[in-house]
Amino acid sequence: MYLVVGLGNPGKQYEATRHNMGFDTIDSLVEDYNVPQGGVKFNAMYGKTMIGGEKVILMKPLSFMNLSGGPVREMANYFKIDPESELIVIYDDIDLEPGQLRIRKQGSAGGHNGIKDIIRQLGTEKFLRIKVGVGAKPKGWDLADHVLGRFSTEDRKLVDEAIAKAAKAVDIIITQGTDAAMNEYNRKVPVQK
């Protein structure tokens, strides 16, 4: 069984913002696999599906980004998920250009407060991450204003493609393994603007 978590902030005012790449990817998976809404548990929306014969729980924490760890820990404990082999977390990354994707098996939070809280709550940095590039903040901008802002039309197109790739990466991780997904998506591919 896998727990696939998309990070974001709940509420209409945060829809389509840079910080909601995880939510957007979960929405894409829900659509791709026609996942019925499972309800709310542990301050998170979730649904269950099957991918490649594996049970998969798709989850969007309803806490704000910086408090994502509690709902993730509670859901993982409830479904007896091993974070090191059965947890996939999808989130935005300002160190990647819009449209780029990176898959990592473990690592630090890299300044991402949602990941920092998950690491704190789980007590480990060893869990799989899919990072969706949203681009660096412009000089002089506040980081919060940047990640809570919306994309230009040009960047939105690139990010929508990256969200589709992130959803496909989840499928590949589950059906073919993490290394296959990393080989497919961690290549340095120039982003066409």
Regions found by a protein language model. Give the residues of each.
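Hydrophobic alpha-helical segments within soluble ligand-binding/sensing domains
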Residues: 111-114
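Nucleotide and nucleotide-moiety/phosphate-recognizing core
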Residues: 2-106, 116-120, 124-130, 137-142, ...
